[in-house]
Amino acid sequence: MRNAIKTVGIVFGGVSGEHEVSIKSARTIIHALKHPININKFDVISIYIDKKGKWWPSEIAEKVLESDPNFDKNIFFKQVEFIGLDHLPKETEKIQIWFPVLHGPNGEDGSIQGFFQLTGKPYVGSGVLGSALGMDKIAMKAAFSAAGLPQVNYCEIHSIDLLDKKRLSYLIQKIETQLGYPCFIKPANLGSSVGISKAYDKKELLNGLDLAAQLDSRIVVEKNIKARELECAVIGKKQIKTSCVGEVRYSSDWYDYDSKYSKNSTKTLIPAPIPEKISKEVQSLSILACKAISAEGIARVDFFYDEEKDSLWINEINTMPGFTEQSMYPMLWDASGIDISQLVARLIESA
């Protein structure tokens, strides 16, 4: 029946460095919602947030989705009569369920979730707390530690520490003693490996800290370990379900931004060629990781696996994983018997 159809607001774009990834993910999700099995379940209203934070209605959002991601949006916007609003497009009043397809700051850090909460309408994914903890690597690691979950050794640094020579010298010595080289330097609140660097000596460490500090005031430095990288997808709120476990192998020195979004630089193995015992442990730890930070609805949990030591460590949790052609989240569910059209429907129904 027509009145049973739900109107879903797909919000994409955003002000973060993962703007283009968000556009690609939104394309995939909207295409899945227009599949024959979903056409009589959902109406879609697409809302585009440009890089300056302005919200644009479906008229323009659809043009963004249809166009080459490299086209000049500023020129395009000048050609249409409708000009961007500082407030919400009027058609958002029709939206019954929000589906934020936003990555990085302001998209999966609790900001947009707080806004959705104020509208009184349900939304796909974690709430404010789960999103905030899942975005900030320092807070996430603290929550994992409190839950007794295995992690690689790390140190936390604040950008203000870099201005105090004595404090910085102490922290460098601490990193060299506790973590050693090589090590990874990560901005605490960015995704898709944006701003991450690998340091093999003190000079590279200092350069990596400077780079991270330009992007975030909170920085994580992690010990480098020789390990395989495993991933597990999660869905559900009251009952959390896990997918099969996948593995990512890459030709570069580490799993950087280019590796994540280039077809030729990575190889995915689904299911991962690992012992069943390890696979079950990954699935179990994935559920515990979600509970530790109050993540729900959708998540992907990443792990390090040292097969020689038969050891697992949680790397991080992503509370709004990508839906691009190279994204593991939909591929893991597809291999688990849930295709993309079924998956997006389940995510909306779990809101």
UniProtKB/Swiss-Prot annotation:
Instruction: State the UniProt keywords alphabetically.
Output: ATP-binding, Cell shape, Cell wall biogenesis/degradation, Cytoplasm, Ligase, Magnesium, Manganese, Metal-binding, Nucleotide-binding, Peptidoglycan synthesis
Q: What Pfam families does the record point to?
A: Dala_Dala_lig_C, Dala_Dala_lig_N
Listed InterPro entries: ATP-grasp, ATP_grasp_subdomain_1, D-Ala_lig_Van_CS, D_ala_D_ala, Dala_Dala_lig_C, Dala_Dala_lig_N, PreATP-grasp_dom_sf
**Reaction catalysed?**
2 D-alanine + ATP = D-alanyl-D-alanine + ADP + phosphate + H(+)
GO cellular component annotations of the record: cytosol
Q: Binding residues for ATP, per the UniProt record?
A: 176-231
Recorded metabolic or biological pathway in which this protein acts: Cell wall biogenesis; peptidoglycan biosynthesis
Entry binding sites for Mg(2+) 1: D302, E316
Signal sequence, renumbered to the chain: none
Which EC numbers does the record give?
6.3.2.4
Residues involved in Mg(2+) 2 binding: E316, N318
Report the transmembrane regions from the record: none
GO BP of this protein: cell wall organization; peptidoglycan biosynthetic process; regulation of cell shape
Class of this enzyme? ligase
What subcellular locations does the record give?
Cytoplasm
**Domain ATP-grasp, first and last residues per copy:** 141-349
The answer to whether the entry has keyword Zinc is no
Say if the entry is tagged with keyword Zinc: no
| UniProt-recorded Gene Ontology molecular function terms | ATP binding; D-alanine-D-alanine ligase activity; metal ion binding
Q: How is the cofactor bound?
A: Binds 2 magnesium or manganese ions per subunit.
The Swiss-Prot or TrEMBL record lists the needed cofactor(s) as: Mg(2+); Mn(2+)
The family classification in the record reads: Belongs to the D-alanine--D-alanine ligase family.
Query: Which NCBIfam families does this chain map to?
Result: D_ala_D_alaTIGR, PRK01966.1-4
Job description of the protein: Cell wall formation.
| Name assigned to this protein | D-alanine--D-alanine ligase
Natural source organism:
Prochlorococcus marinus (strain SARG / CCMP1375 / SS120)
The gene for this chain is ddl
